[in-house]
């Protein structure tokens, strides 16, 4: 593991399992305790591979729930840089165009970085770079309902396209890659992002890690 100047918490689990809600809740509450400049969220979705060389028709056929869809090398390099106190430029991904935009987001080093994404725990290299790993364990039917609503309302998707993607890639990839990665989690959180007891436990553990840096 790289020399540490920050604490990195990985939150994984199925799409629409409540990862983002847990991450944002912890972020908001620790902002009040640490200062908002000392804690930040990095999403794995930002590290989907650049597909600008492909046509739109080819991009929509990409299996975005497979580990190969991610630019893991860039994510790991950014984690290492942040732990060394270096700022990084995080890609901005477009869910409408299914590729990266030409923009980047400057992300400064923080005391606490919350890393959130479906496939984080499937990669041993990422697991080695984080201080604590969390798996949000929410029933797949609940995840599907949430994903359906989110993708139609926020990402301009049609009902049939969401259903087709769920059947062809989302569910199979969850069973093949995401669910088995639960074994690598330090903490498994049931009932998704509204599990108040689990959120409190995670905050206590983060404070413990900070105090023992």
From Swiss-Prot:
GO biological process terms on file: CTP salvage; UMP salvage
InterPro entries: P-loop_NTPase (IPR027417), PRK/URK (IPR006083), Uridine_kinase (IPR026008), Uridine_kinase-like (IPR000764)
Binding site residues for ATP: 13-20
Keywords: ATP-binding, Cytoplasm, Kinase, Nucleotide-binding, Transferase
Pathway the protein acts in: Pyrimidine metabolism; CTP biosynthesis via salvage pathway; CTP from cytidine: step 1/3; Pyrimidine metabolism; UMP biosynthesis via salvage pathway; UMP from uridine: step 1/1
Location of the protein in the cell: Cytoplasm
Superkingdom per UniProt: Bacteria
Pfam families reported for this sequence: PRK
This protein's name: Uridine kinase
Annotated gene: udk
Catalytic activity of the protein: uridine + ATP = UMP + ADP + H(+); cytidine + ATP = CMP + ADP + H(+)
Main location: cytoplasm
Record GO terms (molecular function): ATP binding; cytidine kinase activity; uridine kinase activity
Family designation: Belongs to the uridine kinase family.
EC nos: 2.7.1.48
GO cellular component, one term: cytoplasm
